[in-house]
Amino acid sequence: MQKSALAIALASLLTPISYLHANEAQPQETVVVTANRFEQKASSTLADVEIITRQDIEQTQAKTLPELLRRLTGVQITQNGGRGQLASLFVRGTSSDQVLVLVDGIRFARAAKGAVDFNQIPLTYVDRIEYVRGARASLYGSEAIGGVINIITKARSQQQGTTVSAGLGSLDYQELSIASGVAIGEKGQMNVALGTESDKGYNVRPVPGVNDGDRHGFRSDNALLGYVHQFDESWSLFANARAYENIYQYDNSYGTRDYKEAEKDDLSFTIGTQYQSERWVSELQLTTQKQKSWDYTQSKGKYSDTSDNLEQRNIQWINRYLVNDVWTFAGGVDWRDESYIDKTADKEFDRSNTAAFAVVAAEWQQWLLEASLRFDDNQEYGSQTTHNIALGYQFIPEFGVKASYGSAFKAPNLYQQYDPSYGNVNLQPEDADSAELSFYGLFSGIKWSITGYDYKINNLIDYNSTTKNYQNVIGESNIKGVEFTAEFATGIVQHQLSVDLKDADDSKGKTLQRRAEHMYKWNALVAFEQVDWSIGYQYVGKRPDLDYNTYPTQNITLDAYSLVDTSVSYYVTDSTTISARIDNLLDKEYETANGYPAAERAYYLNIGYQF
């Protein structure tokens, strides 16, 4: 297929976050699957996509998913303390429950009482992460207002070999993992990943005179098993299972020393098949996911207090047809059923959602076009229709423009709808409109882009202290901002810069809680002979927050902070690597949530062996 001038220019801009690894040859084209729900060259999509590869995870020596995601453009992490504690994010000022999280292309079940807790997803079985900024509800449905994060596991990897990794670090941190890909006969591939990690933590919620000396630790055990069978060049079958058991500790209240533990268990199974010909690709997947959450006082034990169960079942059928060198059509059907069991109230709630979507993409000379439409039918809140259209034009080989406009929505979660005390079955989805305009180019070896975005969100769902339940807030919240990104090299150093400036206001014109108006990030990699040196810097400006330990609750402002992390990997041989990482290199004192100090400077050492 002959590529347009615009596609060639976009290909140079849509490089993975892997810093154009100076010590290895690059693939001819970066391929993405999340932008339009089918595999395509990055140069053929108008979406803003960033990619984290497994090599990036190894080079940065990140220990948690939030440590990786905070390097991405427009991402701001909020965390209630250290490893394992509740972690959420904002993308372009939209909240965690307005960002869709996928695992292998399937919606990850959200905790019944809120959004995805990013600290609970282990890195052991992560192979790649694709991050799409901007509304994508016309493809995926609910939650895809601010963007989509697709965590792609090793379940369908074709890479063979075994890697063993062991490490230790500050706060009595220990980790051990093994990942292996093995050929089964001539047409099969088995993938296995096992991991365990723990630390004793620190006092994530210090209250002088009440819990002095407390340490709030974390432990995670996780596993993945995947199998792929290629019957012939066109037809394949795949199946996988993944699980984790995470336990973390915290204090029950501000005024009493009531030590508590929370346990989060997750188990999922997937089976699917794919047919692929020269022009047509069709894939069918069936997935079931079960989550169990316990919250109990340590002295009384696991079954003394509350527990919640959440089950989610998905069927997904996606098709893509390449009409000719210009036009591509895609579409599919999604079905999801969710069950929430509240053990405290001894009640079970269930709802289902059926959806169909269609996409058309065109690539002709200096033009790129994308248009998508989706219809969702939910048994509780009715139907939603969302759309998106994007257009790009290349003026000259080194300069282009693209624009998009779309609609999106976020459905109430199961807790907000069904909780016996605080739920409201009459809640309606939040709805949003988004518009973006982007200029990009290549100048003197610098790849750059500047994007303006504007989100208008209505019917925000929030707790109402007067009615004592969740209600839709009347009025319109507005988030508008500008992003600037740049990639360039100075000698053997590869640089990535991003600037995010935004105003995120509620319907009364007040800044939305915990959103920073200014963020600056710099990521760099030095790859020289047998050594990789990675460094990451971020500045997060002042943010409004609430002090829940006062009555009535007081408005406060969290201080701005700068954070530096660095890591070094030394390749002793082709099979042995020794790595070290320092978190919070400058030992800054800061909070991303009021009353929850972040960890002090921490050191980590790791050794990996491949065979």
Curated annotation (Swiss-Prot):
It comes from the Bacteria. One of its GO terms (cellular component) is cell outer membrane. It is a multi-pass membrane protein. A motif (TonB C-terminal box) lies at residues 594-611. Residues 41-154 form the TBDR plug domain. Residues 1-22 form the signal peptide. Keywords: Cell outer membrane, Ion transport, Membrane, Porin, Signal, TonB box, Transmembrane, Transmembrane beta strand, Transport. One of its GO terms (biological process) is monoatomic ion transport. Gene3D superfamilies: TonB-dependent receptor, beta-barrel domain (2.40.170.20), TonB-dependent receptor, plug domain (2.170.130.10). It is found in: Cell outer membrane. A motif (TonB box) lies at residues 29-36. One of its GO terms (molecular function) is porin activity. Transmembrane segments: none annotated. Residues 159-611 form the TBDR beta-barrel domain. It holds the Pfam family Plug. Involved in the active translocation of vitamin B12 (cyanocobalamin) across the outer membrane to the periplasmic space. It derives its energy for transport by interacting with the trans-periplasmic membrane protein TonB. Belongs to the TonB-dependent receptor family. BtuB (TC 1.B.14.3.1) subfamily. This is Vitamin B12 transporter BtuB. It comes from Vibrio cholerae serotype O1 (strain ATCC 39315 / El Tor Inaba N16961).
